[in-house]
Curated annotation (Swiss-Prot):
It is found in: Cytoplasm. Its EC number is 6.3.4.15, 2.7.1.33. ATP binds at E344, G345, G346, N347, S348, R349, L350, K351, T458. PROSITE patterns: BPL_LPL_CATALYTIC. It holds the Pfam family BPL_LplA_LipB. Pathway: Cofactor biosynthesis; coenzyme A biosynthesis; CoA from (R)-pantothenate: step 1/5. Residues 83-259 form the BPL/LPL catalytic domain. GO terms for molecular function: ATP binding; biotin--[biotin carboxyl-carrier protein] ligase activity; pantothenate kinase activity. The lineage of its organism: Bacteria, Pseudomonadati, Pseudomonadota, Betaproteobacteria, Neisseriales. Substrate binds at Y426, G433, S434, D435, R436, T508. This is Bifunctional enzyme BirA/CoaX. Residues 336-592 are annotated as: Type III pantothenate kinase.
Length: 592
């Protein structure tokens, strides 16, 4: 899985809480000289390397990680009444405890195995548990019951309830999706897999738990402890050791009670925690709907009760998955006039705007990992007169995600050779980023002069448009995040805390921040000078800036430049371009 050595794991454990650590201490953990640490750090996985910040001899990570050291884990386990084992890498933490349970069931009881990486981690229904180092808190433990296996059907929801209690102790509000998923709305925070072994006259339940500690970059519809911690306005960062100790305390107390009294004492609490109680749901097997109805509740065996068209039905977990039934949302009627839903598919986020009578009615956005707000708005606002028109540079897979939320054809518009009286001089218009084209079309909402059109996103684009309607092309450069990331990953000494912009920076962090902004501002001013020369003496050339960093870029341009030229910050420029185009189709056009 990785080629990390014990010294790498020790250093990671020292830094995992996100607090500053002096290089002398880290060097002792790595058994090397402090000046060797930078080269040593380059051996870390790429997603870990970029988290490091250095300042005045101290190292820290910009976010905490779920990484432990054996001694600290042992102390934590003793306080909670558990024996501990730490496996930096293994096939499956459940397999580790299952093997122990088969050999010595008494030893498996209250023995916990924590792992940082699993090659064969799994969830319910054989699904693979995906994770990267440090993103997920993963552990398994054994619990011996003096009961046969068939009497433990409610253990799964009880374990989920214990985890929810623990998270509540830390101020984090969660729900449970039957039978045992920890969720925040539609986003999954964690899952539980329980496997059992019958040995020595006892049933040993092996409880495997995985909780997203930081938001997993490659997993859609996910929540994390760290993001919840910040949403709850808690000071500082979440701590994986505190989280694990709180979980073990609640799991121990709840399972002790469950072993004596069963599920009955927990039923009311579970009903409150159940996200879908009283709501319409679909039950799926292998992706196919096998049943639909309204959740009535869960009984003492952990069995789900549904009210269906055929009457009440009961469902055991097995190979069944539960999903909210969004088809039941009523759709309000709208006037018969044509309405539009305009989409801008950027690299990292989707933006959309509802257009009625030629104006924006509602504007929204969401990351691709959770487009449910778009789906919810579609269910609420759509009718038979809505036409969906979009521009996308995000790739086919993300466009497919958008399509899943909208029950209608999407007209994805490419760049064209000409539109709205503007001629596109790009050599191959089909290769031209459609966002750049619609930014140019949208700029006519704000200026009829020649203008430099700037978009600050994942990439920064700087394009030229003449006053007589010739789009001349332009430049593309990395955005601020990509510039910072490339310095962090590709250099030994420039992975520093974010600095501030100064005329004459005297620290490395400030030099990096100032250099990145100067690069963008310099590119804008270079393009402005070229366009002004081409446009002719005495004729104005405006600057239109859009995107997340637009205001900061406008502020950073030299005062003399701002005094001599018109510089405007325009939100949603692509959507303005789409609106201009469809308005022209209807005989109207937006003007400045």
């Amino acid at each position: 899985m990785t080629v990390l050595k014990p010294s790498h794991w020790r250093v990671l454990a020292e830094l995992a809480d996100g607090l500053p650590q002096h290089v002398s201490q880290l060097a002792r953990e790595a058994d090397m000289k402090p000046q060797q640490l930078n080269g040593f750090w380059q051996q870390m996985p790429a997603h870990i390397r970029g988290l490091l910040r250095q300042h005045d001899g101290y190292w820290r990570l910009v976010r905490p990680l779920a990484v432990f050291d054996a001694e600290g884990l042992r102390d934590l386990g003793e306080r909670s009444g558990f024996q501990t084992a730490l496996k930096h890498e293994c096939a499956s933490s459940n397999d580790e405890i299952l093997e122990l349970a088969r050999i010595a069931p008494d030893k498996a009881h209250k023995t916990i195995c924590v792992t940082h990486l699993q090659s064969k981690g799994r969830g319910r229904q054989g699904r693979k548990w995906s994770h990267r180092l440090g993103e997920c808190l993963m552990f398994s433990f054994g619990w011996a019951f003096d009961r046969p296996q068939y009497e433990l059907g409610s253990l799964s929801p009880v374990a989920a309830l214990a985890c929810r209690r623990a998270l509540g102790c830390l101020g984090l509000e969660t729900q449970i999706k039957w039978p045992n998923d920890l969720v925040v709305g539609r986003d999954k925070l964690g899952g539980i897999l329980i496997e059992t072994v019958r040995a020595g006259g006892k049933t040993v339940a092996v409880v495997g738990i995985g909780i997203n500690f930081v938001l997993p970059k490659e997993v859609e519809n996910a929540a994390s402890v760290q993001s919840l911690f910040q949403t709850a306005s808690r000071r500082g960062n979440a701590d994986a050791a505190v989280l694990l100790e709180t979980l073990l305390a609640e799991l121990g107390a709840v399972l002790e009670q469950y072993a004596e009294e069963g599920f009955a004492p927990f039923l009311n609490e579970y009903e409150t925690a159940n996200r879908d109680h009283g709501k319409a749901v679909l039950l799926l097997r292998d992706g196919e709907t096998v049943c639909e109805g309204t959740v009535k509740g869960v009984d003492g065996r952990g069995v789900l009760h549904l009210e269906t068209a055929e009457g009440e039905q009961t469902v055991v977990s097995g190979e069944i998955s539960l999903r909210p039934d969004n088809r039941s949302v009523s759709v309000p009627k709208r006037p018969d006039s044509e309405r539009f839903l305009l989409l801008e598919g950027g690299n990292s986020r989707l933006k959309w705007a509802w257009v009625e009578n030629g104006t924006f009615a509602t504007v929204g956005s969401a990351p691709y990992r959770d487009l449910s707000p778009l789906g919810a708005e579609w269910a609420e606002k759509a009718d038979g007169n809505v036409r969906i028109v979009g521009c996308a540079v995000c790739g086919e897979s993300k466009k497919a995600q958008v399509k899943e939320q909208l029950a209608r054809k999407i007209e994805w518009l490419p760049s064209s050779a000409q539109a709205l009286g503007i001629r596109n001089h790009y050599r191959h218009p089909e290769e031209h980023g459609s966002d750049r084209w619609f930014n140019a079309l949208g700029s006519r909402r704000f200026s009829r002069n020649a203008c430099v059109v700037v978009s600050c996103g994942t990439a920064v684009t700087v394009d030229a448009l003449t006053d007589d309607g010739h789009y001349l092309g332009g430049t593309i450069m990395p955005g601020f995040h990509l510039m910072k990331e490339s310095l962090a990953v590709r250099t030994a000494n420039l992975n520093r805390p974010a600095g501030k912009r100064y005329p004459f920076p005297t620290t490395t962090g400030n030099a990096v921040a100032s250099g990145m902004m100067d690069a963008v501002c310099g590119s804008i001013m270079m393009m402005h000078g070229r366009l002004k020369e081409k446009n002719g003496a005495g004729k104005p050339v405006d600057v239109i800036i859009t995107g997340g960093g637009a205001a900061k870029v406008a502020e950073a341009l030299p005062p003399a430049f701002l005094a001599e030229n018109t510089v405007r910050v325009a939100d949603n420029l692509v959507i303005h371009g789409l609106l201009n185009l469809i308005a022209a189709e209807g005989g109207e056009s937006e003007h400045a």
